[in-house]
Amino acid sequence: MEIRHSFDVKKCILCAYFVTFFAYLIIGFVPAGATDYIVSARISIPAINLLSDVTTLEKDGRTLHTPDTIVGSYSESENKTLLIGHSSTVFKNLDEAEVGDAIWYNGHGYQIVETDTLLKSEINMDKLLKPEETDTLVIMTCAGEELDNYDATHRLILTAKAV
């Protein structure tokens, strides 16, 4: 008895398309290039297995709108950058980062020198964005108890200095 197998390239490509599409619908998988963000940099924190694209943000009055699935960057000076992202997506493991962990951002090395968790009402954005003498990253995400509209009671803030 002979068994014949046929291979149809068109069916295979169509199948791969549908698998990707349904993965996107079911688990939120987004194929590369499927967002409206312009990638301006990349960030890596190896200790927590973080690797993400970064897009530059513009202020809307006094508000920064956090991207859904990647990191957003904002800077008012050459040597201090604020990076923000959602704790439910890109920064889901950020609370596991520790003082001393390495960060690679835009081709430069940094080391975490401070971690802090503050009430949302205690955040002073002017202080967070104030220029410093050395290159500094400030990374912020939601923490604490979840509130409505994808918000939370606290903010986890990591400060990293260039090495």
State where each predicted segment sits.
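Solvent-exposed, non-transmembrane regions of membrane-associated and secreted proteins
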Residues: 14-163
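N-terminal Sec-pathway targeting helices
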Residues: 1-19
